[in-house]
Amino acid sequence: MKKRLFVLSLILLVALDQLSKFWIVSHIALGEVKPFIPGIVSLTYLQNNGAAFSILQDQQWFFVVITVLVIGYAIYYLATHPHLNIWKQLALLLIISGGIGNFIDRLRLAYVIDMIHLDFVDFAIFNVADSYLTVGVILLVICLWKEEDYGN
């Protein structure tokens, strides 16, 4: 993926995350639940002071440090490995985008705005940036696993 396309995609993904959070705050009261696709997905405005599943509540300094380290390393890795396959680049793009999206919330608000609730399973409420992070990490693990299988 060319550098310009990567940066444009990064900006677009972070903007999509931030716009989704802005919309939720503007249209749904804190704690309110609105069915989006009944029985499948609801929108719920939640202020998360922790990480996934609300662990490590009120430890913002910890998340800021970890986020800076992970994003910094991902950018360093991209810069020093210019010939990565498209799947690894996509994985790192998603990880960086998700990290930046939640980082903006932590710096600006001291919490992360979550809003997506899966009605059909008992699962934590999450946001668009969390989705990027999850898909990015899964994709990166698959890439690394495949490399190990093929001895690369």
From Swiss-Prot:
Membrane topology (UniProt): Multi-pass membrane protein
Transmembrane spans: 5-25, 61-81, 84-104, 125-145
Reaction it catalyzes: Release of signal peptides from bacterial membrane prolipoproteins. Hydrolyzes -Xaa-Yaa-Zaa-|-(S,diacylglyceryl)Cys-, in which Xaa is hydrophobic (preferably Leu), and Yaa (Ala or Ser) and Zaa (Gly or Ala) have small, neutral side chains
This protein's record includes keyword Cell membrane: yes
Positions of the catalytic residues: D114, D130
GO cellular component terms listed in the entry, alphabetical order: plasma membrane
GO molecular function: aspartic-type endopeptidase activity
Key words of the record: Aspartyl protease, Cell membrane, Hydrolase, Membrane, Protease, Transmembrane, Transmembrane helix
Pathway named in the protein's UniProt entry: Protein modification; lipoprotein biosynthesis (signal peptide cleavage)
Biological process per Gene Ontology, one example term: proteolysis
UniProt subcellular location: Cell membrane
Main subcellular location: membrane
Bridged cysteine pairs (disulfide): none
Coiled-coil ranges per UniProt: none
Pfam families, A to Z: Peptidase_A8
Listed EC numbers: 3.4.23.36
Keyword Chaperone appears in the UniProt entry: no
Protein's job: This protein specifically catalyzes the removal of signal peptides from prolipoproteins.
Similarity-based family: Belongs to the peptidase A8 family.
PANTHER family cross-referenced by the UniProt entry: LIPOPROTEIN SIGNAL PEPTIDASE
HAMAP family recorded: LspA
Name of the featured protein: Lipoprotein signal peptidase
Encoding gene (name): lspA
